[in-house]
A protein has these predicted regions:
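Eukaryotic N-terminal low-complexity, Ser/Thr- and Lys/Arg-rich leader segments
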Residues: 1-6, 12, 223-229
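A short beta-loop-alpha structural element at the N-terminal edge
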Residues: 5-24
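Helix-loop element at the rim of GNAT/NAT acetyltransferase active sites that forms part
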Residues: 20-42, 55
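A short helix-loop-beta-strand connector motif used in the catalytic cores of GNAT acetyltransferases and
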Residues: 46-67, 74, 131-132
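Conserved acyl-donor/pantetheine-binding loop and adjacent beta-alpha core of acyl/acetyltransferases
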Residues: 75-142, 196-211, 224-228
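Conserved GNAT acetyl-CoA-binding A-motif
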Residues: 132-134, 161-174
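Conserved acetyl-CoA-binding loop-helix of GNAT-fold acetyltransferases
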Residues: 141, 147-160
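Conserved active-site alpha-helix within GNAT-family acetyltransferase domains
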Residues: 152, 164-166, 175-199
Length: 229
């Protein structure tokens, strides 16, 4: 880990700050564009702060770890072992059903009946029935701060935490560039889930006959992949 990177850790008090960063960093994320298919580009951009506020709140209610680097130039949201963001007991207080309402029928179907089951199946195929793994729910860096290794520093800190507990780390890479970064940090691709085959382009936009949106499921295991500089 880069010892020059200042990283701080917190919890639910950081929901809004993380949402503010993510609304910009994920403006054109392919999976989010695909999920929010009922909104045009401007509507989607305008909605992202609320979207991430709801999701971050659901994560926080499940003991998520919020870490930031260099005064919120980069941030991650991490679910500890045994915790899930789709816990039904916390979705209601998080206001998640407002997200489902905004998604509309098609968006709900894509999130709940397409994305979640496919990723969960891949997860179980690779990790079995164990819940002893960290889930890197979200990580992003502000555009002006990219190229400084901030996301890498956050991930290395997570890897050290996981290694101390002999736990794996799971994530889903939604872009080629992010998958490349994770691979450099020792994550192994265990399979690609393709969303919207025949109806979506790789960037998440609508396209009849499109090849769909690829999501690279990846895992890191302590002692098997290097997380050093």
């Amino acid at each position: 880990m880069n010892n020059d990177t200042n990283i701080t850790t917190g919890g639910k008090e950081r929901v809004a700050q993380a949402a503010d960063l993510y609304q910009h960093a994920f403006r054109d994320d392919p999976v989010i564009s695909y999920m929010l298919c009922g909104l045009d580009t401007q509507q989607r951009h305008d909605y992202l702060y609320e979207y991430f506020t709801r999701l971050n709140t659901a994560a926080a209610l499940n003991a998520a770890i919020f870490e930031e680097a260099d005064n919120w130039a980069s941030a991650s949201v991490i679910l500890p072992p045994g915790k899930r963001i789709d816990n039904p007991w916390t979705l209601v207080p998080a206001g998640f059903f407002q997200v489902l309402w905004k998604l509309g029928f098609a968006g709900c179907n894509r999130m709940l009946r397409e994305y979640e089951p496919a990723v969960t199946a891949m997860q179980r195929q690779e990790l079995g029935d164990t819940t002893h793994f960290y889930y890197l729910f979200a990580i992003a860096t502000r555009e002006a701060a990219r190229g400084r290794g901030l996301s890498s520093a956050l991930i290395r800190k997570l890897q050290q935490r996981a290694a101390d507990e002999d736990a794996s780390v799971w994530l889903e890479a939604t872009t080629v560039s992010s998958a490349r970064l994770y691979a450099k940090l020792g994550f192994k691709s265990v399979g690609v889930v393709t969303l919207g085959e025949g109806v979506a382009a790789p960037d998440g936009s609508k396209e009849q006959g499109g090849t769909g949106v690829p999501v690279d499921c990846m895992v890191w295991r302590p002692g098997k992949e290097d997380h050093s500089e």
